[in-house]
């Protein structure tokens, strides 16, 4: 996850975790201090949505971690709704203020499996995926992520960035990745694109690579102006909407004047047959 540098924590007099996790003004200032190549990235940890669904994170000034899953079995997840926790409210208040100040924000959201593994023991997630309850579980996680993305876009996020470190071919195996994970991801992306046609969706490099390796998508290169950084190229593209990826937002300042557009049309057509 994105980490606030120590010098910035000192400048902002952040001593206790609450100073950065619960204070929209400090989040706003920290985010501005970390702007790179015209972009601000939020949030500073990957536990906000899990917490809004019932997980209990351990907070530190460096971020937040979930040590113990809040639930024991998939059936317990089926009626849960996203709650507006104090941390979520502070983060979204900062996001709204940054957008109001004319800043461009890329908002990171955990993908379906990483989110589920923050709520349930990992072995329960994987065993559920092999059973009928797995389909229900993935459908439920899709609802949560769409709702969370809506909350971010409504407050001005220009890019929704997806990372799902647990969802790689190496971890899942190609059969589970292609047959269970990809349909869920595809449905999620279709819904987000329909709901927010002008918002760019950025898939992390590892997830894109797994999609390429299993022939689930095709890539098209989109060229920006010469000599630009990756961040500047994203700015030029922004507003066009679409899914981009095969690269990492950690490298916004890197020299890269093109984007890789991700197309699932062939996969979508096969599913509809």
Model-flagged regions — what are they?
Residues 1-59, 178-200, 212-273:
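N-terminal basic, low-complexity leaders that serve as flexible interaction/assembly modules and, when applicable
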């Amino acid at each position: 996850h994105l980490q606030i540098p120590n010098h910035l924590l000192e400048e902002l007099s952040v001593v206790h975790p609450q100073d950065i996790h619960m204070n929209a003004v400090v989040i706003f200032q920290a985010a501005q201090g970390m702007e790179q190549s015209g972009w601000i990235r939020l949030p500073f940890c990957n536990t906000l949505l899990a917490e809004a669904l019932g997980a209990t994170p351990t907070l530190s000034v460096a971020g937040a971690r979930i040590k113990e899953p809040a639930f024991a079995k998939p059936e317990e997840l089926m009626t849960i709704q996203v709650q507006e926790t104090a941390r979520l409210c502070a983060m979204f208040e900062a996001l709204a203020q940054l957008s109001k100040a004319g800043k461009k924000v890329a908002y990171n959201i955990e993908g379906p499996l990483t989110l589920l593994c923050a709520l349930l023991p990992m072995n329960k997630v994987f065993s559920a995926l092999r059973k009928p309850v797995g389909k229900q579980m993935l459908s439920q996680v899709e609802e949560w992520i769409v709702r969370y993305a809506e909350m971010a876009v409504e407050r001005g996020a220009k890019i929704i960035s997806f990372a799902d470190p647990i969802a790689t071919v190496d971890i899942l195996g190609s059969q589970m990745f292609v047959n269970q994970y990809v349909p869920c991801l595809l449905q999620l992306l279709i819904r987000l694109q329909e709901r927010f046609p002008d918002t760019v969706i950025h898939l992390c490099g590892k997830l894109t690579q797994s999609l390429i390796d299993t022939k689930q998508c095709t890539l098209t290169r989109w060229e920006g102006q010469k000599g630009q950084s990756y961040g500047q190229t994203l700015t030029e593209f922004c507003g066009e909407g679409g899914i981009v990826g095969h690269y990492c937002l950690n490298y916004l300042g890197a020299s890269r004047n093109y984007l890789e557009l991700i197309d699932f049309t062939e996969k979508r057509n096969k599913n509809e047959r």
